[in-house]
Amino acid sequence: MADPRTFLGALFDLSGKHILLTGASSGLGRHFARTLARAGARVAMAARSVEKMAALAQEIRAEGGLCDVYALDVRDREAIRACVAAAEAVAPLDALVNNAGIARPRAPEKLSDEAWDEVYETNLRGPWVLAQEVVKRRLADGRECSIVNIASILGIRAIGHLAPYSAAKAGLINLGRDLCVDLAERGIRVNALAPGYFITEMNDEWLASPAGDRLRQRVPAKRFGKPEELDGALVFLCSDASRFMNGNCITVDGGHTAGV
């Protein structure tokens, strides 16, 4: 019998794949960039903070990984088009990971139109414009591709004070379903990955607070996730292992959405 490690390695191998990742400068995006590069992909890292990504790129390249850095504000349509065009000039994109996102928690009565628009444009309209730009190119050349929308369990359930965030993440999940119906037969798959609560440098202090501890008690696993515990699902969705999976949402949350 063949070595199972060889079989699994080939199944999930991202070597030769070109993947555009947004929100790559911090939080889960920073971790995702390393993960995809370690799995063999050439990662087109896009975010507003070029300096942070430049430092990350040095680390990835020091490990033998392949990556490029692109300045991108996902609220800017023209910047999106320019970013996708620049990445495509390097090589056709095999996958898009829509990871950029913001929260802006507010009580409903205190939520301004500007805050709502900022969250919506970052978390839903930006991913849509990015997906559309990539889809146009893949339909033109007939290549298959995978679009992975990083959603949230807050697109499935709610905790309050996050109306635009929850609405946008729910929209992101259903955007994938609708695009699947239109694009599946043409070799384009669109799925969502909905993390629960994961510890990053962006939220570690809050998750360690009394309020964070109360939230932890609601997770059946009785702990928060570690970024590396998203690696399997992310690589799966970007790889050929998920070629017949489309319009779905994978939750990785320690059982959070299964609880009351």
Where are the regions that the model predicts?
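Active-site helix of classical SDR
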Residues: 131, 168, 176
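Short, small/polar-rich loop/turn modules that mediate ligand/substrate recognition or access, typified
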Residues: 97, 184, 189, 245-247
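Short C-terminal tail/terminal secondary-structure segment
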Residues: 2-10, 157, 235, 246-260
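Residue(s) in the substrate-gating loop at a strand-loop-helix junction
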Residues: 152
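Substrate-binding pocket helix/loop in short-chain dehydrogenase/reductase
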Residues: 107-108, 115-120, 203, 215
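Conserved glycine-rich cofactor-binding loop
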Residues: 18, 25-26
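Alpha-helical segment proximal to the catalytic Tyr-Lys
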Residues: 136, 181-185, 243
